[in-house]
């Protein structure tokens, strides 16, 4: 994710012999934003150049499904989160989450509130019945991370800093693919 492994940084903090050093590139930050925006724009143009309509009279379709996923207690003080061999995941009440989709021709836009990890996004694109599937997170609100099973098994940050329990991402993937299959007909 760009917030965890950015291509470039305008402001950064490093430690030298235990002392925190803050570097602020100030005005250069605007150049970084412009460069990243241009890169994003070029990628969008490349993708849109590949989108075709098989039938000229296709209709825009909207779909939505709501379902429950396992919940878990979440540490509110992020400074308390740190690597550990076996973090304690305390189950909480199941959470309602939503998958929304807009489909036209061979293009599907899939929107979810949680921040999905790359594995979930790639799986959704790979198994989608649509040739082009764009996965959008934090749609109609945000809901923190929704990590895959291995993130829980390997004590990754996304699992520790999540209101969702182990298995939630896999349920969301199945529900999203089911919605797309239903919309594809």
Model-derived segments and spans:
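Non-catalytic substrate/cofactor recognition surfaces at enzyme active-site rims
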Residues: 1-185
């Amino acid at each position: 994710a760009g917030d965890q492994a950015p291509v470039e940084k305008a402001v950064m903090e490093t430690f030298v012999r235990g002392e925190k050093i803050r570097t602020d590139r100030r005005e250069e930050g605007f150049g970084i934003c412009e460069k990243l925006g241009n890169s994003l724009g070029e990628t969008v143009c490349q993708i849109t150049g590949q989108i075709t309509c098989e039938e000229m009279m296709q209709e825009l379709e909207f779909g939505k499904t709501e379902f429950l996923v396992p919940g878990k207690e979440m540490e509110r003080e992020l400074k308390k989160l740190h690597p550990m061999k076996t973090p304690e995941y305390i189950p909480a009440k199941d959470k309602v989450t939503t998958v929304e989709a807009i489909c036209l021709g061979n293009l599907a836009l899939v929107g979810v509130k949680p921040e999905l990890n790359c594995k979930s996004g790639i799986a959704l694109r790979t198994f989608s019945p649509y040739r082009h599937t764009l996965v959008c997170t934090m749609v109609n609100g945000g809901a923190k991370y929704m990590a895959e099973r291995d993130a829980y098994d390997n004590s990754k940050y996304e699992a520790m800093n999540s209101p969702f329990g182990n298995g939630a991402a896999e349920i969301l993937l199945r529900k999203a693919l089911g919605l797309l299959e239903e919309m594809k007909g």
